[in-house]
């Protein structure tokens, strides 16, 4: 069995890379979870139960991180010594800042006009942009361009927030 301090990738015996076989991750998760699930240790002593709980928690956290592409990229950069620092590093390229303002303006206009179709179209545009940027992020990570990958992660985090705002506006207008 791996150590509690091993990387998420090592825990599931997967290569530490952005591209991930989702079915291999799912299979590895079920395998590890079957070994460490606290129910297997119901008759064990308190110390063994605590360790089993730590392993189960660690396994769940690792799985949740690796199955989400944005969390996986952030974690991979962390392993490479890069702190994405989205909270305190908001510097972004000017073209992306302009795009942000356009998206925000479109959201405000569509919400004010109670135009759900416009919000749906904007959400589709955002999801397309997100897919394209995830492809770019994968290439950056594969090539070792970690600083550029960090900026790409911050941009994707922003896109995710904007998409969530659109979803909230759509829900508000539909209710």
From Swiss-Prot:
Molecular function per GO: ATPase activator activity; protein-folding chaperone binding
Gene Ontology process terms (BP): [2Fe-2S] cluster assembly; protein complex oligomerization; protein folding
A Pfam family reported for this protein in Swiss-Prot or TrEMBL: HSCB_C
Keywords: Chaperone
Record carries keyword Membrane: no
Residues of the J domain: 7-79
One GO cellular component term noted in the UniProt record for this chain: iron-sulfur cluster transfer complex
Family statement: Belongs to the HscB family.
Functional summary from the UniProt entry: Co-chaperone involved in the maturation of iron-sulfur cluster-containing proteins. Seems to help targeting proteins to be folded toward HscA.
Subunit structure, as described in the record: Interacts with HscA and stimulates its ATPase activity.
HAMAP family for the chain: HscB (MF_00682)
Name the UniProt record assigns to this protein: Co-chaperone protein HscB homolog
Gene from which the chain derives: hscB
